[in-house]
Amino acid sequence: MAITLNKLYEGVTAGRRKPQGMASIFEAGFKEFIRHKQQPSMETKMDVSDVMEGSRRAMRAAYNRELDDLDAHLPFLASVGSVSPYIGLFGTVWGIMNAFRGLSNVAQATLSLVAPGIAEALVATAIGLFAAIPAVIAYNRFASSVDRLSVRYESFMEEFTNILQRKS
């Protein structure tokens, strides 16, 4: 049983939630297509190329909104991934400074005097890396997913434009 575009459109728009992803792109393109095809009089009807261009523009606008939504939190992950090692480095420098400060107050330096400051420095380094590594991995994964979805959305828009072209 073949599903018509009208039934698919009804299914997409019948939900309580706003469509997302390809459904949003489909809704925008088909809504514009229907609007242009159902012009009331013959004088105001548009030719096929204008109808198709209107549908393409509507799909492109929906596509851009979808990509904006997908990209919204990537800058935060990028910032965490790039800044965290520097915060860890700052903690390392602070810990080493404390270790040297502790040495300056004693006549003879021993490992037991230096070790707490160095341990503090290494903990700060580890915390910075603990935050940075997962953030960079997550950023790369999500950025790659956004790129793949972008290609899929563009392919969908081209294929759907061809379907609408045959319907006009």
Please give the residue ranges for each predicted region.
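Residue-level detector of functionally special positions within alpha-helical transmembrane segments
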Residues: P85-G88, G128
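Hydrophobic alpha-helical transmembrane segments of polytopic membrane proteins
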Residues: A121-A135
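Ser/Thr-centric signal marking residues that sit
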Residues: S79, T92, T125
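Hydrophobic alpha-helical transmembrane segments and adjacent short intramembrane/lumenal linkers
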Residues: A107-A121
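Predominantly long cytosolic amphipathic alpha-helical stalk/bundle segments
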Residues: M1-Y86, N98-T110, I137-S168
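Membrane-embedded alpha-helical transmembrane segments of multi-pass integral membrane proteins
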Residues: G91-W94, N98
